[in-house]
Every structure is written in C-alpha cells, then in structure tokens.
Swiss-Prot record:
Keywords: Cytoplasm, DNA-binding, Transcription, Transcription regulation. GO terms for molecular function: DNA binding. Coiled coil: none annotated. It is found in: Cytoplasm. This is Probable transcriptional regulatory protein cbdbA400. Belongs to the TACO1 family. SUPFAM superfamilies: YebC-like. It comes from Dehalococcoides mccartyi (strain CBDB1).
Length: 251
C-alpha cells in the first residue's frame, strides 16, 4: 500500500469524546439495521452484519441494543427505512474526502454534508470525483502499551496483513477485506487484545499538508463525523503527529 492517512489512529485518540456525544450507539445500531435488512438477520450468513455486531461489541454496546437493531432490520420490530449513501468532496488544500452516510432522508443528509463542506473551506463534489483514490481495506486497531511492536508487526505480516502503521501507542493493521476476520482471530488466539476491526476506505496515495491547512482539514473531518447521518469519513491527508496533537489540545 502506498499510503494511509492515520485517521483510524486519530479517531482512536478522540474516541472517548465521540462516546460522550451520545451518537456512537445510534450509528452502530443504524449499521446493524441496514446490514440485517440487506443480508438477513443471521450473522453466520451475513458478513456485513457479523462485522457490524463485532464492532458494536468492541464499542461495548449492550447486547439488548444489538438484538433490537437486528430485529428492526429484519422487520421483526418496527423501524425506519435506512438508506446508505457515499458522498464525495474536497477539503482545504484540495484534500479528497469520502463520506459514508446512512439516514432515512437522503436530501437532508446531502444538505447537511454540503453545508459542512462549505463551512469548512471545502466543497461537495459529484459522484466519482474522488472515490477512485480510495479502496476498501480491513483496519485492525491494537493498543500497543506493553507490546513489542516490531514483533507484532512481523506477526501481522506473516498472517497476511498488507501493511502496518504504529503511532502514539496505537497500531493499525491493514488487510484485504476478506482476510480481516481471519487475521483478527489469529491475533486474538495469540493473546493480542483487539481494540477495533472494521472496513475502512483507505487512500491509495496521501498528500502532505502544511500546518494551517492540516488544522483546517482535521476540523472539517471532525465536524462531518459529528453529523447524525454520517457513519464514517475518510481522507487522503497524511497528518503530522505533532499537528494532530496540537489540534486536539486546542479542540
């Protein structure tokens, strides 16, 4: 892989704040509902649902909430119709941004995302404008305190991982989509505690930014993720760790 944005690491650093916003479980439920509706309520035969449930468990979502979301998706319980959409845009400095949204009202979501792009010094673009820059990859997150990161990196590569990034006490292990669950299980078998494992849109190449532009892009990505209808946000910006630390100290 020729580049990554370290956005998983950045999001990990602010994960506690996300939970305080009270949106986390709502977004996790939405993903489960959509997955169950698309592929059925059985995790064994529905890979997307299986991953959504595991992500919810990783985030300590109560099992009752998970079961209720599955039942809403399968139609056993009444729920709103959820649609998925991929919105594309440009941030400050021409950074490519990919927004994964889920909602019951596409027009509202598009309007909210467009407004946030405009407010953050960017612009919403047409479909296909930047999606070609990204590819879907499995990203496994591991807290590395007390671990030999060199040894863990080699283990992950031996298990079939494509790339590894270690930064600020956190490791991202990048895999091909079909290999993520297998590699996660192998790591857990060897006693590695997994913090998160999800499918992310990872940039094929990244762009370096000056500090001022990087701060603007970080703010835009944060504001987009804070929108109720936005599930995930990806960009092709390569953020300097010192700039990220400065941004969070001012946030």
């Amino acid at each position: 892989m020729s580049g990554h944005s370290k956005w998983a690491t950045i999001k990990h650093a602010k994960g506690a704040a996300d939970a305080k916003r009270g949106q986390l479980f709502t977004k996790l439920s939405r993903e489960i509902i959509f997955a169950a509706k698309q592929g059925g309520p059985s995790p064994e035969g529905n890979a997307r649902l299986r991953l959504a449930i595991q992500k919810a468990k990783d985030s300590r979502m109560p099992s009752d909430n998970i079961e209720r979301a599955i039942k809403k998706g399968s139609g056993e319980l009444e729920g709103t119709t959820v649609i998925e959409m991929i919105l594309e845009g440009y941030g400050p400095g021409g950074v490519a941004v990919l927004v994964n949204g889920m909602s019951d009202n596409r027009n509202r979501t598009v309007s909210d995302v467009r407004h946030m792009f405009s407010k953050g010094g960017g612009s919403l673009a047409e479909s296909g404008a930047v999606s070609w820059i990204f590819e879907a990859k499995g990203v496994i997150g591991v807290e590395t305190a007390g671990l030999d990161t060199d040894e863990l990196s080699l283990k992950a590569i031996d298990m079939g991982a494509e790339d590894v990034n270690t930064d600020e006490g956190y490791m991202e292990i990048y895999t091909a989509m079909p290999d993520m669950e297998k590699i996660r299980q192998q790591l857990e078998t060897q006693g590695v505690t997994i913090d998160s494992a999800e499918i992310n849109m990872v940039p094929k190449n990244t762009v370096k930014l000056d500090e001022e532009t990087a701060m603007q892009v970080l703010k835009l990505l944060d504001k987009l993720e804070e929108l109720d209808d936005v599930q995930t946000v990806s960009s092709n910006a390569d953020f300097d760790p010192e700039v990220v630390e400065k941004y969070h100290s001012q946030a």
